[in-house]
Amino acid sequence: MTTQSEYDYIIIGAGSAGNTLAARLTEDAGVTVLLLEAGGPDYRLDFRTQMPAALAFPLQGRRYNWAYETEPEPHMNNRRMECGRGKGLGGSSLINGMCYIRGNAMDYDGWAKEPGLEDWSYLDCLPYFRKAETRDIGPNDYHGGEGPVSVTKPKAGNNPLFHAMVEAGVQAGFPRTDDLNGYQQEGFGPMDRTVTPNGRRASTARGYLDEAKKRSTLTIVTHALTDRILFEGKRAVGVAYLVGDSDTRIQARARKEVLLCGGAIASPQILQRSGVGPAEVLNKLDIPVVHDLPGVGQNLQDHLEMYLQYACTQPVSLYPSLKWWNQPAIGAKWMFLGTGIGASNQFEAGGFIRSSEAFEWPNIQYHFLPVAINYNGTKGVQEHGFQAHVGSMRSPSRGRVQVKSKDPREYPSILFNYMSSEQDWQEFRDGIRLTREIMQQPALDPYRGREISPGIDVQSDEALDQFVREHAETAYHPSCSCKMGTDEMAVVDGQGRVHGLQSLRVVDASIMPIITTGNLNAPTIMIAEKIADKIRGRQPLPRSTADYFVAGDKPARGKPLREISHQA
């Protein structure tokens, strides 16, 4: 038994991109949209997703997290590694770390050098970043003031460790920047976050859907698991999906287009299950081939990161807030006033550096955290501490996503192939050693205790490599598995249209040709804003005329205030 309905557009996935498209397309009178989301609602009374400081909670369990695992990663001691992905209205913007980082201007200028992607330069993209954003301190040439995404800048009076860590980075010889999303990304400075003025997570469900839900032309179905995209010949005409635990396939038809916004894991999986992908993969599973497209699921990229943890000699870290007896007061202050520790994701400082002159723009990212704990909330150090998250930005390693079954409830096979190049290993060795130099600068003298992790005995290349193999974790930035472009491995063109098919687009982080320098939520929203104008037949926003930093022949680093020698 099937039931059927018809809409202008069907959007698969109510995440960072899907919600953006749903809101923008329904701004046009009479345009009907069906938005399908495999997860549930974004319950506004659930502190796990709404309180910024509770960011570790939605990663635990499977209510809001698909909780994928990789195949054994061959260069990481064959570990099966986490691959968390958001499930529910908001997608990964419902469970992410809320770091608002756009990437480096050179990322987009690099995309624009590819044939067919000429209009993806930084100055073409910047107007769409601005369109999406409302920054709490007001708009300027780089930031918006009227968009659906609430962005909060760190305020005076926040934790002194943030300021000490930025100062230490500057004392180590690296630049200072007052805005990681402004004129110059390179350097250390305050980190913006997607949090509302009253201290709530600013997911795309809150920012975009709250307005769009008021329109009768938008239909949202939660707990709707997409089985496959329906085709007539080479034209996408609809979607078959399941609701809840039912095995009844419901069919919905799209008069204009099907818009796939499942993210870098689900989008290639859904394409392959629908008969679009490498023919040899589909044939093994007896999936009828609609279109042999070898790049679907290939080119998978991510950011890997390490934690360097230190004891804190003054009682200024967030360690007491991890204790259950302190949490009711923190929760009450957040609930009723929208302020306090609960209102921040606690990633309020960070930076981007070049580990050597070989890189034209930053290849290492830092997040600073005034507590020593794993990102997913596990293995908290039982004392006052602080840590730096450090990771490489544009690894040459490439992975893949492959469907394992026709069953939409079966997870795909995921392999990132982390650390498969010598460049990866050199960047992590350099990153750890540079971080140690930063941590030894005078600004941290009042706070710095012993090195908890990796530990001062971990010094040689071999020891550092072993530590990375055992302890590096994902930064939860999968991307690039349905890349834009014109070469034989490209899946979509510069407007997200799937090569060789009609009426089907992919719009999410999977279409990035190369991963950006930083967190992926802001770029994903920008991509959706930009392609929304294409779908609507609107003229693109005028190119920005803002200036932006290009390192050129400037050195990656100046002379440090305190010289640190590395033990052999």
UniProtKB/Swiss-Prot annotation:
Its EC number is 1.1.99.1, 1.2.1.8. FAD binds at residues 8-37. HAMAP family: Choline_dehydrogen. It catalyses: choline + A = betaine aldehyde + AH2; betaine aldehyde + NAD(+) + H2O = glycine betaine + NADH + 2 H(+). Involved in the biosynthesis of the osmoprotectant glycine betaine. Catalyzes the oxidation of choline to betaine aldehyde and betaine aldehyde to glycine betaine at the same rate. PROSITE patterns: GMC_OXRED_1, GMC_OXRED_2. Keywords: FAD, Flavoprotein, NAD, Oxidoreductase. This is Oxygen-dependent choline dehydrogenase. The active site is at 477 (proton acceptor). Pathway: Amine and polyamine biosynthesis; betaine biosynthesis via choline pathway; betaine aldehyde from choline (cytochrome c reductase route): step 1/1. The keyword Flavoprotein applies. GO terms for biological process: glycine betaine biosynthetic process from choline. InterPro entries: BetA, FAD/NAD-bd_sf, GMC_OxRdtase, GMC_OxRdtase_N, GMC_OxRtase_C. Disulfide bonds: none annotated. Belongs to the GMC oxidoreductase family. Its cofactor is FAD. One of its GO terms (molecular function) is betaine-aldehyde dehydrogenase (NAD+) activity. The keyword Nuclease does not apply. One of its GO terms (cellular component) is membrane.
